[in-house]
A protein has these predicted regions:
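Cytosolic catalytic regions of ATP/NTP-dependent phosphoryl-transfer enzymes
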Residues: 2-146, 152, 158-170
């Protein structure tokens, strides 16, 4: 075999996302806010499920306590989701370049690139003290601050290394 082309999702991976790290960018713990955001969204997308599974597995999963004023679900066009809470501000999760735009620093871009090595997907968890503007389809609030990076992996199937080794030897 000279060339082997694979669509990794579901072929060499299980198709099940798993959060490997939540890296604070400001020294604070953001697990409670991240879980409250996922509760408010009520999403069953792979990223949301991976976040909740991480905290269930760690025995941390907090009770839902915050009341969301607004929730905007993830879309592949926007590449982010958000939940706005009374007295807590707005939390946003998604692709850093779509959330921050021109405000994304070179240092953050480099950190995301480094964390992405090895096939990880890295999403930004950000906060704003402001509420999002009320426009159709949803929009981001002003003054967004990156607070954490969430590193996610798609688990490799147990038999994948042996399968790939077989093809390499052919």
């Amino acid at each position: 075999v000279d060339v082997l082309c694979l669509d990794k999702t579901g072929t060499i991976t299980e198709g099940r996302m798993e959060v490997s790290d939540v890296i604070s960018l400001d020294g604070n713990d953001h697990e409670k806010a991240l879980c409250e955001m996922i509760y408010a969204l009520g999403d069953n997308n792979p990223t949301a499920l991976a976040v909740m599974d991480r905290y269930k597995k760690d025995g941390f999963l907090p009770e839902r306590e915050w009341s969301a004023k607004t929730a905007i679900h993830f879309s592949s066009a926007k590449k982010w989701s958000l939940a706005a809470f009374e007295d807590k501000g707005t939390y946003i999760l998604g692709a850093a370049e779509f959330i921050l735009g021109d405000a994304m620093t070179d240092a953050l871009r480099e950190q995301i690139k480094t964390l992405s090595e090895g096939g990880y997907r890295v999403v930004l968890f950000a906060h704003s003290d402001n509420m999002p503007p009320e426009v159709e389809g949803g929009a981001l609030p002003e003054n967004i601050t990156p607070v954490a990076l969430v590193r996610i992996t798609d688990c490799i199937r147990k038999e994948a290394p042996a399968t790939l080794k077989y093809f390499a030897e052919q």
